[in-house]
Amino acid sequence: MEGENDPLLGSYKPKRRRSSLVYGLSRPQFLDTAASEVSPIPQERPTTSLRKPTPRVQRPATDVSYGALEETEENESIASGLSVQEDFNSKAWWKELTLLIKFATPVVLTSLLQYGEVVTTVFSLGHLGKTELAAASLSNMTATITAFAIYQGIVSALDTVGTQSFGSGNYEMVGLHLQRILAILLLIQFPIFLIWWKIEGILLFLRQDPLTCMFAAKYMRVMMLASPAYALFEALKRFLQVQGIFHPVTYILAIVVPINIFLNYLFVWSPWVGFGFLGAPVAVALTLWSACAVLIIYIMKVNGRQAWGGFSREALKNWGPLCRLAVPGVIMICSEYWAFELVTFASGVLGTTELASMSVLSTTSTLSYNLAFGVAAAAATRVGNLIGAGNTKLAKLATHVSINLGAAIGVIIAVILFLTRNTWTYIFTSDKDVVALVATIIPLVALINIADNTQCVAGGLLRGQGRQRIGGVVNFIAYYLLGLPVAIILCFKLDWGLYGLWIGIGAAILIIAGVETWCSLHVNWDHLVELANRQFDEA
């Protein structure tokens, strides 16, 4: 079969099946950018695809659609070996920035739409009564810290093996890694189901209100229907993202979120088929399974199938390299989730006003974090693809641009929060005590968000570089050996209250931002390419 050699890799690459409707790319724009900017890097790499590779169709290097860069003098300067600092004012720098923003935007919208599903549930059940509202909030928190955050940590391994495999042209390896991820997610459903089935006793042990625990236990048992769907959706979403396909998930959620609102009304409030409190988790389960079904149809019929080589028994073997990325990814993500939940729990000890204020501040911080998370996801895909392609110069530039973009977003949001500190809280509540308390603390939270946005992007870069272990270790030490102890001491021993809690958690975030940013920027890029090659061989 005829084919051509890729100038980046010097070896045959498999052909991708081209879709008639292109939301992503037949060849990722991330790699077209690389091909147009970098002089050929001759290197031999053994093909690790399970099947005999077929030639890949390569679009012209001068194609500027979907973010590909034009051939310019600035691009040539990168290829000729100029440092990244010397190119920061070049057209290539701004093209890189535009590309990241373009692909971060749908990820941000996706995160906000997914968050909207939770808001819909809380809003719907909140009108049934305060016990139902408390039970829904407690259930959502429990589901997040015992399952959903773990799923996100596991699928984050695709940020490394998926992006690098796709960047190297080993497209079907992405599908193989996806199958391994799905197998792991399936296995951990069983211990999670056991915890959820016995959750009432666990919550009572933690001294929660007995009536709230009873409602939460019923809610969690119904949510067992939604748990596999959430895991599948996260895996499929990441499967598309590592291919540079970002928009379809946003479009799908834009369709199913209104459906979720309708189902909440139908199952919770409708006089014909509504059955009250338990109607909300049923609506969540149906919404998630519907989203999965549409996403699978999109992949098989429109775009994304090019990285799916079919089911293989190889997916049941050689989980070691994947687990070595997934475990620190879980620690990296769950450490942050759990730390914030513990701080929220501690604020409840201070009183109702403090708990309500913490809720406002945490929600504000989450909204800010979602913006940075979009940049982190795009940066992980971008850098991982470029490492897989052997394009270290452009990977270095993308890293610098990503860090600067994350910090800039944090600064902009900090300024907005500072200027609206006396009015922002009225979006959530009109309680004067809560408004006054939030107004005194939100300048501190605004400053913390600068570091939080930066560390979020740096964490994404570490995942794209395959260095999750650094993030896992740094997050655990910063939050649990420094941040939380300091927060508890300042809050309860020195009576600094909510201010002390945020100083403690802010100190942890500042350390994480500094260490992870330094690590993501100071990299032996050639060594990362060698590690990627080694992972291909192991897989």
UniProtKB/Swiss-Prot annotation:
Region listing for Disordered, in residue ranges: 34-63
Any one GO MF annotation of this record: xenobiotic transmembrane transporter activity
GO biological process: xenobiotic detoxification by transmembrane export across the plasma membrane
Protein name: Uncharacterized transporter C4B3.13
Family: Belongs to the multi antimicrobial extrusion (MATE) (TC 2.A.66.1) family.
Subcellular location, record wording: Vacuole membrane
Swiss-Prot/TrEMBL keywords: Membrane, Transmembrane, Transmembrane helix, Vacuole
Species of origin: Schizosaccharomyces pombe (strain 972 / ATCC 24843)
Gene Ontology CC: fungal-type vacuole membrane; membrane
InterPro entries attached to this UniProt entry: MATE_euk (IPR045069), MATE_fam (IPR002528)
TM segment ranges: 103-123, 141-161, 184-204, 244-264, 277-299, 325-345, 360-380, 399-419, 434-454, 470-490, 496-516
